[in-house]
Structure formats: structure tokens, C-alpha cells
A protein has these predicted regions:
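Extracellular/periplasmic envelope-modification machinery, especially enzymes
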Residues: 1-238
Length: 238
């Protein structure tokens, strides 16, 4: 299985999957390709043994937003009506879920819609977790070839990468503030992977986190999954 197949397969396998009738809590993960990473993370951490997961995919070009009028955010060359929070099957799945986890490669243009989107989700009376965006800079295979492995965890980012990473940091802070105002838990995905930092090298604990700077390898998914598992354990123990 290549890196792209790894990212997408599990998400496709559980897309709008019906929940089993058992004592497990039912969790619906909604989002773009970052939701594929989140699905992989929870499975790598074995969270599926205690929770029943289902998924729904909305392309980043359409915006992962529960808002009817967001044409200014959508790619006009893409049929975003096919991927919408207003899909009847999705609404039914939300109603059958105990929790809804929403994640995206969030853009600055998403921020102005976020309050309305969260309002519409909360009307459905479900526990919501909002996950932030993440990025690890440009992945350049030549850099890894030309540098000793001992230096891989001290990767130096280009100016272009730093601009992108600081923009992601700014977006996550804005989402944190909005989430807090609605008493919704915000999960900073970047911090979970980067040990609380706003950005970190794409090499950790002996392997690569991301094959393209955006999406997680199995190693990266395991790191995120264990961090989420620990986070949920801490919440349950309070």
C-alpha cells in the first residue's frame, strides 16, 4: 500500500457506515483530507475498540462548513452540492451519533463562516469537537538525502514554509477563540503532534511524520492517535 492509499483507505471503508448496536459511543468524523488522517489516527491508537467510528468527506475546495450560502468560499469549478452538511444521509448520521468531530485544512476564508457553522451544528444537540489544522513544511526528499540522519530532527524551514506555518498558527488561535465562545472543545492537532509547539520538524522518534507536509504517514498517525487517546483519558479522569 503506497502513502496515498494509506491516507484514504480507512476513511472510505467507514464512510457513513452504520453504527453497531452495542455499548460503544458513536463518533462521526466529518472533514476533508485531514479527516482521513484523523480516522487513521484513532484506528492506529486502537480507539475503535471502545468507540464506533463513521466518516463523511467534504473536499477542502468546498469548505467543511455547515452553512447554506458559502459560494464565495467554494471552488466554482467543483460541484460542491455533492458534498454538503445538508446531505440527508449525513443529517441522519449526525442524529445517530453521540459525538461529532469536525476537522479540515482550515483556511482564513473559513473563519468568517465558523460561528454560523457551529451554531447550526449545535442546534442538532450533539457534543462537538473541533480539530485544528496542521502542516509540517515542504517535504524535500533531496534534503533528507543530503543531510545526515542525526540532523533530520533539526530541520530548518524556508521563509515560505515559515509564512505558511505562522498562518496555520493564526488560524488555530482564531478557531480556539471561537470554540471557547461556544463552549466547544477545540483540539489543536498541530500541538498534539508537535509536543505543544506551533510547528516542528517532519522527523520524530526515528521516522517521517508526513510524506507531503500535510498528510500523515502511519508513523505520524500513530503519534497523533496516541496523543488523542491520552487527551481523552485526561478528560474522562477529570
Amino acid at each position: 500500500m503506497n502513502s496515498t492509499e494509506y491516507v484514504t483507505k480507512r476513511h472510505k471503508d467507514i464512510r457513513l457506515a452504520q453504527y453497531k448496536k452495542n455499548e460503544k459511543s458513536n463518533i462521526l468524523i466529518i472533514g476533508d483530507s485531514h479527516s482521513e488522517d484523523l480516522v487513521n489516527a484513532v484506528f492506529e491508537a486502537g480507539l475503535n475498540l471502545k468507540k464506533d467510528f463513521s466518516s463523511y468527506y467534504i473536499p477542502v475546495r468546498c469548505g467543511v462548513l455547515f452553512v447554506k450560502d458559502k459560494k464565495a468560499r467554494e471552488d466554482p469549478n467543483f460541484n460542491c452540492q455533492r458534498f454538503s452538511f445538508f446531505d440527508e444521509k449525513l443529517i441522519t448520521q449526525i442524529s445517530n451519533s453521540d459525538e461529532v468531530w469536525i476537522i479540515s485544512s482550515w483556511k482564513e476564508s473559513d473563519i468568517k463562516y465558523m460561528e454560523e457553522s457551529l451554531n447550526n451544528i449545535l442546534i442538532l444537540d450533539k457534543k462537538v469537537r473541533l480539530f485544528g489544522t496542521k502542516n509540517f513544511g515542504k517535504v524535500d526528499a533531496r534534503w533528507f538525502v543530503n543531510n545526515e540522519i542525526d540532523t533530520w530532527n533539526t530541520q530548518i524551514f524556508s521563509k515560505k514554509d515559515l509564512i505558511k506555518l505562522r498562518n496555520k498558527e493564526k488560524i488555530n488561535k482564531a478557531l480556539t477563540n471561537i470554540s471557547n465562545s461556544y463552549d466547544i472543545e477545540f483540539v489543536n492537532t498541530q500541538h498534539l503532534i508537535c509536543k505543544g509547539k506551533d510547528f516542528c520538524p517532519n522527523y520524530r522518534d526515528g521516522n517521517i511524520i508526513s510524506h507531503d507536509g500535510d498528510h500523515l504517514t502511519r508513523h505520524g498517525a500513530k503519534i497523533l492517535g496516541e496523543s488523542i487517546k491520552n487527551l481523552l483519558t485526561e478528560k474522562n479522569n477529570k
